[in-house]
Amino acid sequence: MSEAANVELVVGLQPAPDVDLAQLFRDEKLWRELTEAVADFFQPDFECGFCRFDTEKTYAGLDGLRAMWLEWLTPWATYRTEIENAIDCGDRVLLLFHDFGRRKESTEEVRGTVAAIWTVRDGKIDRADFYPTRDDALKAVGLEDGCGSYVKEKEP
C-alpha cells in the first residue's frame, strides 16, 4: 500500500466532525454497527493506547479501543474531534486534531489540540496511539521541528 493510501485509509476511518464520540462509544448498538462496518480495515492483533503522563496503557482489539475511549470520556457529556491535518510519515500517519467537549458538570464547550499516530501494516490499521499534546506526537515520529505541511507553532 502506498503512503498516500495509508493517509486515505486512516482519514477515511475517522468520525465526521459532528459525531459525538461520547454517544458513539457509550451506545452498545451504535458501537456494534460501527465495528461490523470497519473491522476488515484493522489487523486482527490491532492495539491502541493513550500516551500520557509518562505512562502508556495498551488496549487490544476494537473492543479495547472502545474501553480506552470510555475511560477517557468518563467526565465528558459530549466530545467530538475535527482533523486539522493528516501527515504522511511512511507506515505511520500523524493526525492533528481540534477536540471539542463539554464536561458533565458544565454548560460550556472547551477546545483542545491533540494528536494521534496511526500505524498501517499490510494495508490495515495495526496500532493507534493517542497523545494529549502535539509536541509528544511530533517527537514520537521524529518531527520535533515540524514536517510536511505542518510547522509547529511557536509560543509568543
Where are these regions (language model features)?
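A solvent-exposed, acidic/Ser-Thr-rich amphipathic alpha-helical stretch
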Residues: 33-91
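Short, low-complexity N-terminal intrinsically disordered segments enriched in polar/charged residues
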Residues: 1-44, 144-156
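A short linear-motif detector with a strong N-terminal bias
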Residues: 19, 26-28, 60-61, 73-75, ...
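Generic anion/oxyanion-binding catalytic loop in active/binding sites
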Residues: 27, 54, 126
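Positively charged, low-complexity intrinsically disordered regions
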Residues: 15, 53, 103-104
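A beta-strand edge to alpha-helix "cap/lid" segment located at domain peripheries
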Residues: 1-9, 67-156
